[in-house]
Structure formats: C-alpha cells, structure tokens
A protein has these predicted regions:
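Noncatalytic alpha-helical scaffold of FAD-dependent oxidoreductases
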Residues: 1-265
Length: 265
C-alpha cells in the first residue's frame, strides 16, 4: 500500500493484468477502453504476439503463459495509483467492461507483486529468446496508435514479398505507438537467407511505417545509420527545411554534425 514517508515521498501502487485479445484492432480499442476508466494512470500497455510467447517458452521451459490461449495477442497492462486497492478496483472495472464488449477475451489480474513480476519476465525475455530462436532482421519503428493494426497488415504483406517464409514478431508499447518489428528466420531452417536480404526487408518495413504517418526510429534515435534513409523517405522540401533550421540554430555545425540532418554540400 502507498504511504507518505518523512521526506514527503509517495509510494506508487500498481495493478497488473495479462489479457488475451483476438486481433490487433481489439488491442488498440482495449487501450482506449482502459483509459476511459483509468485515464493517464495507465503506465504500461504492451502488445505481445502469441508467437513471441512461444519463443520465450522454447528458450525457458519453466516459463508459462499466465493464461494459455489460441488467440493471437496478449496485452500486459499496468496502472499506477497512490493506493493499491484503488488501482486494483479501477483495473478490475476496466477489464470487466472490456470482457463484456468482447475487446478482451480473457484476463488474469496479478494477485501480488511476484505474479506481476512473472508477467514482466515474459515481456522482458522476448528480445533474447528471439535471438536464441535464430536470425532476425530487427526494426524500431513508431506509428500513430490508431494506425497500428493497418501497419501490421501492410508491413507483413510487404515483408512477404521479399521474404515469403519470414516469421513476423511485432511487439511493443501501444500507448505511444512504438513497435519492435522483426522478420525472423523460421526455426530449424537449413540455410538461413534473411541476412542476405536484410536491406530489402528493412526498406519494406520502413516504407510502410512512413506510409502510415510514422517514424523509422522510435526509441533508439536516427544518428548516422538511418540519416540517409530517412532523407530518402521524406520530401526534399522537408529535408531542406530541417537543414535551414539546423543552420540557423547551429551555424558552425558543431552540434552532432552529420547526424539526423544531412550536411549540405
């Protein structure tokens, strides 16, 4: 339970749920429904594909899906409030509402901190378990929240044109539209091929992210690696405007030269 200490610090109490959803559209709508009840106290809302859970379980046989289901998506939702009982009641009410209208098909509310930590262990194990699964071509993109389902559909189709056998693993922070999007080599493939066509896969994913009003760099920045690609994906006028702003603010070009904005020749 939350309490105020002698230095005036307030502890934060959290309520955490593991939810099964039938579609990416339902995941996005579920976020809106939970926010109707919890507002800005929704501090985490992670969408996880069932295939990623399978990868974690293959890598860590002791890990169990808190709510086994044939549905394609899981959501790890957490709200944070001053009082534990208030957080739990709010999330329970939101989940009951979501279950009634079909946005959530099933849900497990963590009974204690240990169970909540177990939920998070699954989420945090995905990157390393994906690596153990095999070769993957990874991306860090963002799209407007409302466009997440459409992006997932068109990006999967675009990747399939380049790498028909690739397995897609997309997971991330629905609340801000940040997605970790990977094209993975099928398990046990005799001759891995994705590494040789990674540039084409990345171009396809990034093109779709931009087409949906998103960004090719969500959490990890643009830097030098994505600078030229980003310039190629936006209009010359947009690049020229950014260069003009850069010159006005940094006429000596001493702040991160050559990063994000291409140098003018």
């Amino acid at each position: 339970p939350a309490s105020r200490g002698t230095v005036g610090a307030r502890c934060v109490a959290r309520a955490t749920a593991w939810i099964s959803c039938a579609s990416a559209e339902d995941v996005v709508a579920l976020l809106g429904r939970v926010r109707e009840h919890a507002g800005d106290t929704v501090t985490s809302f992670e969408m996880l594909p069932a295939h990623a859970i399978d990868m974690v379980q293959a890598d860590h046989p002791d890990v169990r899906d808190p709510n086994p289901s044939s549905l394609p998506w899981r959501v790890l939702c957490e709200i944070s409030m001053a009082r534990e009982e208030h957080a739990r009641e709010t999330l329970e009410t939101a989940l009951a509402d979501a279950l009634e209208v079909g946005l959530a098909r099933d849900a497990v509310l963590a009974e204690n901190l240990t169970q909540a930590a177990d939920f998070w262990t699954i989420r945090e194990s995905i990157p390393l378990s994906k690596r153990a699964y095999g070769t993957s071509v990874n991306h860090d993109v963002s799209v407007p929240v409302s466009r997440i389902p459409a992006f997932l559909n068109t990006a999967a189709a675009a990747v399939a044109e380049v790498a028909p056998d690739a397995e897609i693993v997309a997971f991330g922070h629905v609340g801000d539209g940040n997605l970790h999007y990977s094209a993975c080599e099928p398990k046990g493939v005799a001759s891995p091929t994705l590494g040789g066509i990674s540039d084409r896969i990345t171009a396809a994913v990034h093109r779709e992210a931009m087409a949906h009003g998103g960004s090719i760099s969500a959490e990890h920045g643009v830097g030098r690696l994505k600078r030229d690609e980003l310039a190629g994906l936006r209009s010359p006028a947009a690049t020229a405007a950014m260069q003009a702003i850069k010159r006005a603010l940094d006429p000596q070009n001493i702040m991160n030269p050559g990063r994000v904005v291409p140098d003018q020749g």
